[in-house]
Amino acid sequence: MSKEKFERTKPHVNVGTIGHVDHGKTTLTAAICTVLAKVYGGKARDFASIDNAPEERERGITINTSHVEYDTPNRHYAHVDCPGHADYVKNMITGAAQMDGGILVVAATDGRMPQTREHILLGRQVGIPYIIVFMNKCDMVDDEELLELVEMEVRELLSEYDFPGDDLPVIQGSALGALNGEAQWEAKIVELAEALDTYIPEPERAVDMAFLMPIEDVFSIQGRGTVVTGRIERGILKVGDEVAIVGIKETVKTTCTGVEMFRKLLDEGRAGENVGALLRGTKREEVERGQVLAKPGSITPHTKFESEVYVLSKDEGGRHTPFFKGYRPQFYFRTTDVTGSIELPEGVEMVMPGDNVKMVVDLIAPIAMDEGLRFAIREGGRTVGAGVVAKIIA
């Protein structure tokens, strides 16, 4: 079977459904695919094909995730849906499924539930920038006042976690009604699609961001100087650009005097490409794996941060025993391990394999970081956890 050519004509946006178990996330995902296929063309997907989510492994963590795609006249969406609560936690923390926006599904019959809060908190911690609410099962509630009450509660809950609760779109609908072809509920799915188009801004493309390349290797070339290699994460590196070497040691500035790819000289390297960058006047021992090459001033080195962490279960090859405060593993950022100590939240004495937990990490050497940076927790090269930088402290 030949792969269909991917059309690059429309902006591409990543979204996903979040919310409490059994509130209708997967039904809504199926309804969006089905209704939009009917209205705008595209491929319909039924509930069963989405619910039967394939197992994926991201950094050694097993996650069940379904990926579907759909189109509106203006955009192409990639949408992720997870069957279980644990899958959401893992997905959001590892960044396996990056979201430019989330669709929070809340059943009108239940209102806000524990996982509603947890997913909003996780969304805030891992940096999901925009949330749209779909109040589901509204066909099962006759009382208009009850619907208003649920909407108000959800808006308040979102505001509590610094989302603009008063202003974000809330759509009252019925995913099942829409799946069954009932016109009034199909219209609500179209309304949701329009909200996605207007409320979630077009994400900035990696190539348009400030230049950053994690350094994987360092070579010195006789008569030419020092070359660092790596895959450009974002932005563009042009010959003649001033760059900063950030992390582990003092930040130093230098100039890139050459860019090469597959032994050919180029004028520039772009996001996604593996390149070698020749650095002017830099000695081989001044640069090491684990540092980054970046546009000066665009990223700073830090040692202390608050993070959201998922600890691998024993079945995933993680620890067999809990850990306590004073635990000192390695934290693997981009290309290297750095030892660090942890502080657990008040009232948390120990962390069990399979848990997710908020912790403050203090590294022994600074790493170039932004909020939203992912890392792995390792013991002797074996991954035992995954995390994301939620807030930089120092």
From Swiss-Prot:
Its main location: cytoplasm. CDD domains: EF_Tu (cd01884), EFTU_II (cd03697), EFTU_III (cd03707). GO terms for cellular component: cytoplasm. Its EC number is 3.6.5.3. SUPFAM superfamilies: EF-Tu/eEF-1alpha/eIF2-gamma C-terminal domain, P-loop containing nucleoside triphosphate hydrolases, Translation proteins. Mg(2+) binds at T26. Monomer. GTP hydrolase that promotes the GTP-dependent binding of aminoacyl-tRNA to the A-site of ribosomes during protein biosynthesis. This is Elongation factor Tu-A. The lineage of its organism: Bacteria, Pseudomonadati, Pseudomonadota, Gammaproteobacteria, Vibrionales.
